[in-house]
Amino acid sequence: MKIIVTNHAEERAKERLGWNKHAIKRMAERAYETGISHYDTDGKLMKYFDKLFLVEHQANNVRIYGQVVYLFSNNRLVTLFIIPKNIEKYIKNNNMFHVKQKED
């Protein structure tokens, strides 16, 4: 699926991660296709996803890929940010994290 990167998402990726346009597009496509989704989570990580959906009303698809949270509205990347430190351990303990890492 073709991913559209909004201006806001592009600015945030440059500011927070130092990525250029090409890197943003490439990573957004990877996150959309193979990132950890709400469906793949449980426990504390699921609660974190639920909170993101409540706070970010535009987003209907949240993905975690690597150490970054991507918020999509359909096929548009709305914004992205680095995973908070207190959530990292739940991602590494999540079974889908290990399955998806082996696939890559």
Labelled PLM ranges:
Residues 1-104:
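Ribonuclease/tRNase effector modules and their secretory precursors
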